[in-house]
């Protein structure tokens, strides 16, 4: 089974930080060996919407948000790791590693 990381990034204005966080998470996830899909909610609406199948198949789900995402109820049945946009932008690789360590310790 392949590793799949999905994320949702959103900020109040939805101009720069949303897309900076999405790019940082995507680059770090690919580097860590994940298949990646990232939904953005910004000034241009919802882009690259995460489907029910994406959510069901995800190994890791991250919300990097500064606002409550639209259609947030899609994620109610899954563990979602919430981080700030700044954390995603500045330390995406470190965040992914921390989440992997948390998951590994929960499985022991």
UniProtKB/Swiss-Prot annotation:
Documented EC number(s): 2.7.1.202
GO annotation, cellular component aspect: cytoplasm
Keywords: Cytoplasm, Kinase, Phosphoprotein, Phosphotransferase system, Sugar transport, Transferase, Transport
One MF annotation (Gene Ontology) recorded for this entry: kinase activity
Superkingdom of source: Bacteria
NCBIfam families, alphabetized: FRU
Purpose of the protein: The phosphoenolpyruvate-dependent sugar phosphotransferase system (sugar PTS), a major carbohydrate active transport system, catalyzes the phosphorylation of incoming sugar substrates concomitantly with their translocation across the cell membrane. The enzyme II FryABC PTS system is involved in fructose transport.
Record protein name field: PTS system fructose-like EIIB component 1
Organism: Escherichia coli (strain K12)
């Amino acid at each position: 089974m392949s590793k799949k990381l999905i994320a949702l990034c959103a900020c109040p204005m939805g101009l720069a930080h949303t897309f900076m966080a999405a790019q940082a998470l995507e680059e770090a996830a690919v580097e860590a060996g994940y298949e990646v899909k990232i939904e953005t909610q910004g000034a241009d609406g919802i882009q690259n919407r995460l489907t029910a199948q994406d959510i069901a198949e995800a190994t890791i789900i991250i919300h990097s948000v500064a606002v409550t995402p639209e259609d947030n109820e899609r994620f109610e049945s899954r563990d979602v790791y919430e981080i700030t946009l700044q954390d995603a932008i500045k330390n995406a690789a470190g965040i992914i590693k921390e989440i992997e360590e948390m998951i590994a310790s929960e499985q022991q």
